[in-house]
C-alpha cells in the first residue's frame, strides 16, 4: 500500500471512532423521548407513598401515567402532588420534555437548595409549596424564563433576599413566597400581579410604591416592613419623621373640607344614578312571559353583557363615522372573541348571542361560581356554569383539557357541550337535567311537598354514580383524583332518575388555594392528615355519598357542628344489626330489603376507611355495588350475618312492608 494511502487510512481509523465518541457524549438529554426522559427523572426520586408511580413503566405510553398530562401527545404538565416524594429533581432529565409547561411538586418532602429551573426556559407554571427546600435562591435563578407566569414557593425554608430575577419576569401573574425566611427589601416588580403573598417572612424596609394599594395581609408577619398599605408607616424606626407640629395643623385644617367634598360628590352621583335607572326602567318596560329573572339575567350575572354591549356601541359609532368602519370592526373582532367552542358535534349549534338573549333562571351558586338555566329561542334548555376560580391553567392548557373532557362519553356523565374562555372567568355549557341535583332530591323534596326517593331509586342512583366514577378512573388515568369533587350537589338526575356526574376532572384547572379550601377531595382523611391525594380519594367521596343517600344526613352539617363526620357517626351507631334510627325515614316501606340496605351501608363504610391501604379501590367498590339487588333473593344469606341471635328475625320470607323507619 502506498505511504500516502496508509497515512490517510490511519487518520480515518482514528478520527471516525473519535467523532462517534464525541457525538455519544455530547448527545443532549432532550434527544430522549418523553417516556425515556420521565423514567430517567424517576430515578432521582425517593417515593414515600407505595405504588404512587407504579404506572410509570415503559410498557405503556407516558400520557397514561399517573400525574402526567399531555397536549397533542406530548407531556406538558407533571402534577406530582401529595406523594411524599423526596430525593432530587433531575433538571437535566426534565429538559428532555420539550413541551413541558407546568411543574407541580406541592406537598412533598423535598429538601436542599432551589433547583436550577432556569434550564427549563419554556416553563409557564412552577409549584413547589409545602416542601422543605431551603437556603438562598440565587439572584439570577429565573433569568431567561420569559414565559413563566406562576411561581408558588410558599411554606418552605428559603432564606436570603427575594431573587431580583423573579421580579423582572415579564409575564409573571402569581407569586407566593409566604411562610419562608426571606430577608431584605421587596424588589420592584415589572407590573401588577394578580396574586402576591409575602407574609410570614423576615422582610424589612419600605414597601414599593407600586404595591401601596395591595391588601395589607400580603405583608403580615414581616415586622421590619413599613409604608403603605401598612398602618406602621409613621411608626417605623427605619425612617426619619418630620416634626409632627408642622404636619398636624395642615392635616386638621384640610380634613373636614376633603370629607365634605367627598360626601357631596357621592350624594350627587347617587341621585343621578337613581334618576338614570328609573328613566331606563320606564323606557324598557315590556310585558313578558319569561322566567322570573328576566331575559338579561344571564348577561348580568355572567359579566358578558358589558363586553357585548360595548361591541355593539363600537359598531354603531363606526357606522356613524362611515369611512372608518372596516378598520374599527376588524380591530374589535381581533380583540374580542365571543364564539362558543363546541365539544360535541352531535348537538345543535348556537352562539354566545343566543345565550345572552335567552331567558335565564339561577339554579344555584357555590364557592366557584353560579349555575343558570338558559332557555334558547328554539326552546332548547341548557345549563351555563360560570367559574371565576379557574385560572390554574393558561388558555392553551385549558382548551386542551376541555377537549380531553369533551371526549368522555358515558350515560352517567353530564357531557360538557361547549365552553367559553375569558381570562377573568370561564363558562361551561351543559345539558339541563330535569330533576335537578341529588342533594335537592334528598334534602328538600319533603319541604317542597314532593315524594322522597324510595330504596330502589336510591340503589339505582348509587349504581349509576359508581359506574360513572369507574369510567372516569379508566379514561382519565393521569389525574390523581379523576373526579375530585364528588358530592350530592354534583350528581344530577334525569327524568327517569338516572344519575349524571358533573364538575368532574376540574382539579387541574381550579386555582390551587380555592381547590384546597372547597373541593371534596381535599376533605378526605388522607389529605387532612398527610396532605396528599390518592386514586382512592374519589372512593372516599363515593362512600360518603352512599352514607348520605342511606341516612338522609347532609355531610357538611357534621363538620360545622362537631368534630364528628358522617362516616364516624354511622360507625358509632352501626353494630352489625338493623338500626332504623340510622336510615332516612323517606325510604318508606319496601319488601325484602333490609339485607341489601345493610350490604350497601357496609360498602359505604368500607369506602370511607380512613386507612387508604385498607380502603376499597374503585374496581372493588363497583363490583360489590353491582351485586346488590332491590330485594332479597332466596339464595341470599347475607342478612344472617347482620342479625343477632336475640333479634330472631330472618330475611327468608320476611317482608319489609312491616318495617318502619321512624
UniProtKB/Swiss-Prot annotation:
Residue positions, PTM Phosphotyrosine: 527
Transmembrane stretches, start-end: 257-277
Catalytic reactions on record: L-seryl-[protein] + ATP = O-phospho-L-seryl-[protein] + ADP + H(+); L-threonyl-[protein] + ATP = O-phospho-L-threonyl-[protein] + ADP + H(+)
Residue numbers on the Extracellular membrane side: 32-256
Database matches in Pfam families: LRR_1, LRRNT_2, Pkinase
Keyword Phosphoprotein appears in the UniProt entry: yes
InterPro entries linked to this entry: Kinase-like_dom_sf, Leu-rich_rpt, LRR_dom_sf, LRR_N_plant-typ, PRK1-6/SRF4-like, Prot_kinase_dom
UniProt GO molecular function: ATP binding; protein serine kinase activity; protein serine/threonine kinase activity
Domain Protein kinase: 357-639
Carbohydrate attachment residues: 197
Positions carrying Phosphothreonine: 457
Disruption phenotype: No effect on pollen germination and growth. Prk1 and prk2 double mutant has no effect on pollen germination and growth. Prk1, prk2 and prk5 triple mutant shows reduced pollen tube elongation.
Modified residues (Phosphoserine): 359, 437
GO-annotated cellular components: apical part of cell; apical plasma membrane
Positions in the Cytoplasmic compartment: 278-662
Protein keywords: ATP-binding, Cell membrane, Glycoprotein, Kinase, Leucine-rich repeat, Membrane, Nucleotide-binding, Phosphoprotein, Receptor, Repeat, Serine/threonine-protein kinase, Signal, Transferase, Transmembrane, Transmembrane helix
Domain of life, source organism: Eukaryota
Cellular location(s): Cell membrane
Signal sequence segment: 1-31
Basic and acidic residues: compositionally biased ranges: 646-655
Function: Receptor-like kinase involved in the control of pollen germination and pollen tube polar growth.
Domain remark text: The protein kinase domain may be catalytically impaired due to the lack of the conserved Asp active site at position 485, which is replaced by a His residue.
Subunit structure: Interacts in vitro with ROPGEF1 (via PRONE domain).
Protein name in the entry: Pollen receptor-like kinase 1
Origin species: Arabidopsis thaliana
Lineage: Eukaryota, Viridiplantae, Streptophyta, Embryophyta, Tracheophyta
Amino acid at each position: 500500500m502506498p505511504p500516502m494511502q496508509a497515512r490517510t487510512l490511519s487518520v480515518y481509523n482514528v478520527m471516525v471512532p473519535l467523532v462517534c465518541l464525541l457525538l455519544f457524549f455530547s448527545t443532549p438529554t432532550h434527544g430522549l423521548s418523553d417516556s425515556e426522559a420521565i423514567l430517567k427523572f424517576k430515578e432521582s426520586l425517593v417515593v414515600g407513598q407505595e405504588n404512587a408511580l407504579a404506572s410509570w413503566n415503559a410498557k405503556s405510553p407516558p400520557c397514561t401515567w399517573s400525574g402526567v398530562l399531555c397536549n397533542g401527545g406530548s407531556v406538558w404538565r407533571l402534577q406530582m402532588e401529595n406523594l411524599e416524594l423526596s430525593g432530587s429533581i433531575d433538571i437535566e432529565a426534565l429538559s428532555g420534555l420539550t413541551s413541558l409547561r407546568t411543574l407541580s411538586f406541592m406537598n412533598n418532602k423535598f429538601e436542599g437548595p432551589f433547583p436550577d429551573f432556569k434550564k427549563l426556559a419554556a416553563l409557564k407554571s412552577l409549584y413547589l409549596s409545602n416542601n422543605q427546600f431551603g437556603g438562598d435562591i440565587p439572584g439570577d435563578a429565573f433569568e431567561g424564563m420569559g414565559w413563566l407566569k406562576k411561581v408558588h414557593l410558599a411554606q418552605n425554608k428559603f432564606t436570603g433576599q427575594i431573587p431580583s430575577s423573579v421580579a423582572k419576569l415579564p409575564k409573571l401573574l402569581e407569586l407566593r413566597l409566604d411562610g419562608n425566611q426571606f430577608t431584605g427589601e421587596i424588589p420592584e416588580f415589572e407590573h401588577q400581579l394578580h396574586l402576591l403573598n409575602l407574609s410570614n417572612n423576615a422582610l424589612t424596609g419600605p414597601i414599593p410604591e407600586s404595591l401601596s394599594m395591595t391588601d395589607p395581609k400580603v405583608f403580615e408577619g414581616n415586622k421590619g416592613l413599613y409604608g403603605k398599605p401598612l398602618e406602621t408607616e409613621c411608626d417605623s424606626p427605619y425612617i426619619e419623621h418630620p416634626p409632627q407640629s408642622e404636619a398636624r395643623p395642615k392635616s386638621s385644617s384640610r380634613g373636614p373640607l376633603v370629607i365634605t367634598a367627598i360626601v357631596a360628590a357621592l350624594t350627587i352621583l347617587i341621585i343621578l344614578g337613581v334618576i338614570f335607572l328609573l328613566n331606563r326602567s320606564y323606557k324598557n318596560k315590556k310585558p313578558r312571559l319569561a322566567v322570573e329573572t328576566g331575559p338579561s339575567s344571564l348577561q348580568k350575572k355572567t359579566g358578558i353583557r358589558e363586553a357585548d354591549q360595548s361591541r355593539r356601541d363600537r359598531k354603531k359609532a363606526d357606522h356613524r363615522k362611515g369611512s372608518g368602519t372596516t378598520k374599527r370592526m376588524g380591530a374589535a373582532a381581533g380583540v374580542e372573541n365571543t364564539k362558543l367552542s363546541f365539544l360535541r358535534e352531535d348537538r345543535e349549534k348556537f352562539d354566545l348571542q343566543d345565550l345572552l338573549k335567552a331567558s335565564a333562571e339561577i339554579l344555584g351558586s357555590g364557592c366557584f361560581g353560579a349555575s343558570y338555566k338558559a332557555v334558547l329561542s328554539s326552546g332548547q334548555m341548557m345549563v351555563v356554569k360560570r367559574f371565576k376560580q379557574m385560572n390554574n391553567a393558561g388558555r392553551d392548557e385549558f382548551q386542551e383539557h376541555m377537549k380531553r373532557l369533551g371526549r368522555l362519553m358515558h350515560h352517567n356523565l353530564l357531557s360538557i357541550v361547549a365552553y367559553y374562555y375569558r381570562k377573568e372567568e370561564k363558562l361551561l355549557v351543559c345539558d339541563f337535567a330535569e330533576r335537578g341535583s341529588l342533594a335537592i332530591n334528598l334534602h328538600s323534596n319533603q319541604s317542597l311537598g314532593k315524594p322522597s326517593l324510595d330504596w330502589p331509586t336510591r340503589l339505582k342512583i348509587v349504581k349509576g354514580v359508581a359506574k360513572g366514577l369507574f369510567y372516569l378512573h379508566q379514561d382519565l388515568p393521569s389525574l390523581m383524583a379523576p373526579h375530585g369533587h364528588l358530592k350530592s350537589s354534583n350528581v344530577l338526575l334525569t327524568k327517569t332518575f338516572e344519575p349524571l356526574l358533573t364538575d368532574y376532572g376540574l382539579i387541574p384547572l381550579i386555582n390551587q388555594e380555592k381547590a384546597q379550601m372547597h373541593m371534596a377531595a381535599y376533605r378526605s382523611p388522607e389529605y387532612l392528615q398527610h396532605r396528599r391525594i390518592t386514586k382512592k380519594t374519589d372512593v372516599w367521596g363515593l362512600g360518603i355519598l352512599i352514607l348520605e343517600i342511606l341516612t338522609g344526613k347532609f355531610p357538611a352539617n357534621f363538620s360545622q357542628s362537631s368534630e364528628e363526620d358522617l362516616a364516624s357517626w354511622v360507625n358509632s351507631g352501626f353494630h352489625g344489626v338493623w338500626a332504623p334510627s340510622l336510615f332516612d325515614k323517606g325510604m318508606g316501606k319496601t319488601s325484602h330489603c333490609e339485607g341489601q340496605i345493610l350490604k350497601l351501608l357496609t360498602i359505604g363504610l368500607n369506602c370511607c376507611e380512613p386507612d387508604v391501604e385498607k380502603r376499597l379501590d374503585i374496581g372493588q367498590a363497583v363490583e360489590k355495588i353491582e351485586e346488590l339487588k332491590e330485594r332479597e333473593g332466596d339464595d341470599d344469606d347475607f342478612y344472617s350475618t347482620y342479625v343477632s341471635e336475640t333479634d330472631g328475625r330472618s330475611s327468608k320470607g320476611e317482608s319489609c312492608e312491616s318495617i318502619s323507619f321512624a
